[in-house]
Amino acid sequence: MLDLFRVFSNEAKTSKSVAKERLKLVLVHDRVDCSPQLLEMIKTDILKVIANYAEIEDDGLEIKMSKCRGEHDDKPVSALVANIPLKNIKDRCM
């Protein structure tokens, strides 16, 4: 999936912005008690399953853990957030 805003923006990834994103990722992993290795295993498994049914676009692919408020009791809960752009759905008859 082509992100037109990203293509036409003047925003270049600086080492500062990359370091900031990495630090955010480390902090989120610490808060949700999920190691980067575990998240990578989850990501790999999810992508394998989806690849059985659709062709995945690598650009824009993002899978991460985050904290959010619970729906019923407002307690913090861990959430797996995935943005997986698809090129097309495979035609499969079962």
UniProtKB/Swiss-Prot annotation:
One GO BP annotation of this record: cell division
UniProt function note: Prevents the cell division inhibition by proteins MinC and MinD at internal division sites while permitting inhibition at polar sites. This ensures cell division at the proper site by restricting the formation of a division septum at the midpoint of the long axis of the cell.
Entry keyword Transport: no
Protein family per UniProt: Belongs to the MinE family.
HAMAP family found in the cross-reference section: MinE
Keyword field contains Cell cycle: yes
Keyword set, alphabetical order: Cell cycle, Cell division
This protein's name: Cell division topological specificity factor
Domain of life, source organism: Bacteria
Coiled coil region boundaries: none
